[in-house]
């Protein structure tokens, strides 16, 4: 995982998928500390690295899968004064979309998959960043908080060296009409597993 933050995605992947090797890369020391604590608290076998994701190829190469939840917002857009660590998670202060895609491509094997969450409104930017870094967008899923709402996020799957051809998956709705998680989200987060 590139830009692992406090490790939520890595923890979920480790518990649900049990990969042979899982490496979580995070640049911010304060977030890296949370990541390490999360891994230890959950008793998981996740390698953690405090480094810039652009240097990830020094720790990983030939990866089958890379996941990334990069900063969504352009530099100096919105939110006024917030903690620097939070600002770096939300805004392209330390890395932009093209840099994140380049980092993913540098560690993926040919035909490896890159999963990325980003703003739905930046679909064109995502497609351009992926293609510029030798990856082709293969699947996309719009994410809505509630059914009937306009999607704000999207989940993308790209393949390094993949051929042209995008498949749209059904929308992912996070909350049901009562405000609880939908069965799909509960399954994704392994909420009903013992």
Give the positions of each predicted feature.
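Conserved SAM/SAH cofactor-binding pocket of Class I
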Residues: 1-79, 102
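Mobile active-site "lid"/loop adjacent to the S-adenosyl-L-methionine
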Residues: 70-99
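SAM/dcSAM-binding transferase cores
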Residues: 150-194
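Short, solvent-exposed coil/turn elements at secondary-structure transition points
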Residues: 54, 143-146, 161
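Phosphate/oxyanion-binding loops and surfaces in catalytic or ligand/nucleic-acid-binding neighborhoods
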Residues: 73, 133, 161
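Conserved Class I SAM-dependent methyltransferase catalytic core
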Residues: 94-151
């Amino acid at each position: 995982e590139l830009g692992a933050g406090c490790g939520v995605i890595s923890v979920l992947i480790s518990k649900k998928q049990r990969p042979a090797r899982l490496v979580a890369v995070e640049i911010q020391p304060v977030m890296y500390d949370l990541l390490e604590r999360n891994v230890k608290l959950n008793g998981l076998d996740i390698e953690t690295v405090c480094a810039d994701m652009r240097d990830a190829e020094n720790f990983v190469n030939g990866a089958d899968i890379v996941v990334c939840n990069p900063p969504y917002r352009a530099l100096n857009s919105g939110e006024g004064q917030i903690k620097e660590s939070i600002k770096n998670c939300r805004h392209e202060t330390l890395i932009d979309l093209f840099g994140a895609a380049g980092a993913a491509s540098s560690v993926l094997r040919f035909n490896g998959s890159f999963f990325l969450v980003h703003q739905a409104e930046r679909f064109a930017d995502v497609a351009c960043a992926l293609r510029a870094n030798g990856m082709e967008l293969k699947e996309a899923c719009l994410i809505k908080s509630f059914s009937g709402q306009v999607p704000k996020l999207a989940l993308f799957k790209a393949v390094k060296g993949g051929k042209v051809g995008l498949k749209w998956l059904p929308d992912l709705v996070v909350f049901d009409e009562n405000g609880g998680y939908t069965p799909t989200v509960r399954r994704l987060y392994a909420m009903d597993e013992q």
